[in-house]
Amino acid sequence: MQPQGQTGQVPIVQGNVADPNVEVHWYGDAAKKLLTSGTPGSENTPFSVWSGECDGPFAITFKSKSSMLDLSGLGKVRWVVKTSGFHVVRPVVKLADGTMLVGDHADASVPQLAAREFSFSDVRWIRLDPTRVVTVNGGRGAGPANPNNEIWVVNPDLTKVDEVGFADLMPGSGHGTGGYIHLGTVEVFGKAIPRGTATASNR
């Protein structure tokens, strides 16, 4: 959403989140260069965020102040995206133990803003360094040999997810047609788990 008084292309702020119970978190230096774009209510240029000025990989996540999320089972995301060049939008989760993961689901080659939906149960995950926003070994190196250089995180616990969001692992190309992502609304569907408890309820 666009808070009152915000005009033009400016870095996103907490006020761009429609739900006052949800915090936005930035990962990677380039995340602070993610800009607002478009006009609320416009059919031709709807309000969204745009990554063209992000000069490195970044991730943006959202955190409910009151609850964690159980995204196992039927947990899913519906978001509105547009991409340019070889850029893709990928899901990101931060688990209860602080581990950050980026998924292999990738929305690419979306020339106009369009709704995309996917289930977390269909996603494979790789560990993400939250500072550099790059993929890293998931910790299996201490165990048996990892065939084919695979670094997938095996059976991550998605029953208590602290934050959920998106990532673009490529630097943007700047203004004009080139390489970037647009992202409008983000809706997450799962079970709310009140912080400090282990009881899930429908959300």
Language-model features: locations:
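Beta-rich carbohydrate-recognition modules and glycan-binding surfaces
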Residues: 1-203
